[in-house]
Regions:
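Flexible "stalk/tail and boundary" regions
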Residues: 1-7, 12, 23-88, 96-146
Length: 146
C-alpha cells in the first residue's frame, strides 16, 4: 500500500523523481510502467500500470452510455499518457497536465493506497485549509465501518 506524503521537485523537462518512500514498493510490487492522468486537472494521478489495468477492466464492464463512465473516460484520456519510470526513478508528466495542475518546482507526492497523487504544494496546502477533516467526514467513515 502506498501511504504517506513526501516533497519532490519537477525538473525543467517536466520529470518528477518518485520519493524513496514510494519507489522501492512500486518497483517491487508493480514494475516501472505507469498511467499518468487526472480526473479534474487539479492534480496528477500516477497509477502503476497493473492497478490502472484493473480499473480499466472494471470501467469496461460498465455501460459505456453511463454519463459518469463517459466523463471518467473523457477526462482520464484527455490528461492521460502511458509512461515508464527511468533508472533514476523519474516519471515524465505530460505538458498539458503539468500546466493544468500547476505542478512545477516544489510538489507534494501523496500515497493513496494504490496510486500516487502529485500536487502543487501551495495548492494542496490551500485545499487542506479549505476542506478540513470534519465531524461529518468522521461520521460518514464510521458508517462505512472505519
Amino acid at each position: 500500500m502506498l501511504r504517506g506524503n513526501a516533497p519532490a521537485k519537477v525538473d525543467e523537462k517536466g520529470r518528477v523523481k518518485i520519493p524513496s518512500i514510494f519507489r522501492a514498493e512500486i518497483e517491487q510490487e508493480f514494475g516501472n510502467e505507469f498511467y499518468v492522468t487526472s480526473l479534474r486537472g487539479d492534480c496528477v494521478r500516477l497509477y502503476p500500470f497493473p492497478i490502472w489495468n484493473e480499473l480499466e477492466q472494471k470501467i469496461a464492464s460498465l455501460p459505456q452510455s453511463d454519463p459518469a463512465v463517459k466523463v471518467f473516460l473523457r477526462n482520464t484520456n484527455y490528461y492521460g499518457q502511458m509512461t515508464t519510470m527511468d533508472n533514476q526513478g523519474r516519471i515524465l508528466i505530460p505538458a498539458l497536465l503539468r500546466d493544468s495542475a500547476q505542478v512545477r518546482n516544489e510538489v507534494s507526492v501523496q500515497g493513496h493506497l494504490k496510486y500516487l497523487e502529485i500536487w502543487n504544494a501551495e495548492i494542496l496546502r490551500r485545499q487542506l485549509d479549505e476542506l478540513p477533516f470534519s465531524e461529518e467526514h468522521e461520521q460518514a467513515l464510521s458508517k462505512l465501518g472505519i
